[in-house]
């Protein structure tokens, strides 16, 4: 076994030190840096209208949501002083809750290639009864939630409470559509993750090359490259992921605040939206104790970029500011 490894290491080392081997080594490191950014920008940029329906199961908005989406798009243009060609967007709705129970998006509202987004499937429900009828027909024995099969008796009181969490008022819909426009605005929405990846993998590639050539242990050997490259690439991947989560957190909080400050009704709609999400999660946690590892006692989902309870509390603060404004307006009247 030892001799086999030594022979492989010697042959691979000799090849890496050859002209072809050096080119392959540099080519691999260069491809690591630029491969993902190029692919990501193409998929989410020029080809977004083609790739988005392939990645997600979507369909046109129901008729009752179209006026709300159009109104919020117009509000966004007015507030940001933009014209339609500088804020291209295609708003759709998800066919099911298989992909996500939140909005999915690709592209950016801040670039000419535009933004594609699909609001959650449950946005189509006009009332709790419609939601209950849907779940009864599609999930008669229960439903999948965070990878767990949760049994639900749809004729029970708890089922009525649960389905009510999927029925939102027009205020909540107005908040949702405007929030999503702010959440995916700007060049960073398209390129942040790509730029971050290129930055971290540039460092990892430089250190890989340096360790491979200068390490006192196995320096210059194929084994040193085979060990250093995946370890440092893994570190770059982790750093890129954490950086993206931080970006997503800051952007989500900003989008919530901008949408909530559009009007008193938007703020109330945002509170309703997140409160029902928390309540829904708590109900599922009570029904299925194995979900305790994924859902907190408040109804938050562990590990997501922006905790739901944080978003709800932030909107409560915004709402307090609105209440103060209401009092001032009332005094003026």
Curated annotation (Swiss-Prot):
GO terms for cellular component: membrane. PANTHER family: TRANSMEMBRANE PROTEIN 177. This is Uncharacterized protein R144.12. It comes from Caenorhabditis elegans.
């Amino acid at each position: 076994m030892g001799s086999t490894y030594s022979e492989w290491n010697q042959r691979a080392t000799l090849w890496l030190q050859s002209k072809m081997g050096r080119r392959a080594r540099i080519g691999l490191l260069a491809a690591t840096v630029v491969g993902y950014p190029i692919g990501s920008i193409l998929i989410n940029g020029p080809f977004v209208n083609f790739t988005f329906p392939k990645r997600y199961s979507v369909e046109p908005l129901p008729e009752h949501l179209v006026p709300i989406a159009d109104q919020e798009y117009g509000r966004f243009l007015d507030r940001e002083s933009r014209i339609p060609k500088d804020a291209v967007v295609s708003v759709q709705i998800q066919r099911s809750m298989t992909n996500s129970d939140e909005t999915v998006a690709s592209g950016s509202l801040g670039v000419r290639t535009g933004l594609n987004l699909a609001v959650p499937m449950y946005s189509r429900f006009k009332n709790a009864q419609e939601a209950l009828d849907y779940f009864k027909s599609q999930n008669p024995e229960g439903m999948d939630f965070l990878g767990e099969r949760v049994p639900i008796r749809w004729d029970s009181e708890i089922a009525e409470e649960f389905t009510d969490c999927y029925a939102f008022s027009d205020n909540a819909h107005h908040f949702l559509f405007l929030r999503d426009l702010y959440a995916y605005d700007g060049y960073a929405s398209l390129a942040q993750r790509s730029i971050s990846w290129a930055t971290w993998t540039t460092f990892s590639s430089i250190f890989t090359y340096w360790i491979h050539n200068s390490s006192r242990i196995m320096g210059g050997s194929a084994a040193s490259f085979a060990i250093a490259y995946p370890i440092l690439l893994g570190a770059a991947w982790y750093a890129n992921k954490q950086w993206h989560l931080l970006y997503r957190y800051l952007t989500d909080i900003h989008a919530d605040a901008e949408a909530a400050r559009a009007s008193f009704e938007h703020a109330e709609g945002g509170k309703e939206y997140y409160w029902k999400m928390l309540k829904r999660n708590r109900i599922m946690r009570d029904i299925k104790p194995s979900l305790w590892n994924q859902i907190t006692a408040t109804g938050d989902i562990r590990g997501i970029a922006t905790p739901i309870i944080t978003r709800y509390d932030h909107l409560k603060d915004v709402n307090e500011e609105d209440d103060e404004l209401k009092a001032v307006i009332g005094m003026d009247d």
